[in-house]
Amino acid sequence: MAVCQICGKKTVFGNTVAHSATTERRTWKPNLRRVRVVLEDGSTKRIYVCAKCLKAGKVKKAV
């Protein structure tokens, strides 16, 4: 579910590293929004889009 349907951005796994070099597992999740979008054929559909794609204008929002 946590995948941008425009660019494919998804959850990334890694470590938080303290000053003492101890590591702790963590995740970074994309800033997803569920948006109603106008498709090429004129129909509307709700899809998950990351905030970066929304700001870049890669999708046309339905009004």
UniProtKB/Swiss-Prot annotation:
Disulfide bonds: none annotated. Pfam families: Ribosomal_L28. The keyword Transferase does not apply. Coiled coil: none annotated. GO terms for biological process: translation. Keywords: Ribonucleoprotein, Ribosomal protein. InterPro entries: Bacterial_rp_bL28, Ribosomal_bL28, Ribosomal_bL28/bL31-like_sf, Ribosomal_bL28_bact-type, Ribosomal_bL28_sf. GO terms for cellular component: ribonucleoprotein complex; ribosome. One of its GO terms (molecular function) is structural constituent of ribosome. Belongs to the bacterial ribosomal protein bL28 family. HAMAP family: Ribosomal_bL28 (MF_00373). This is Large ribosomal subunit protein bL28. The lineage of its organism: Bacteria, Pseudomonadati, Aquificota, Aquificia, Aquificales.
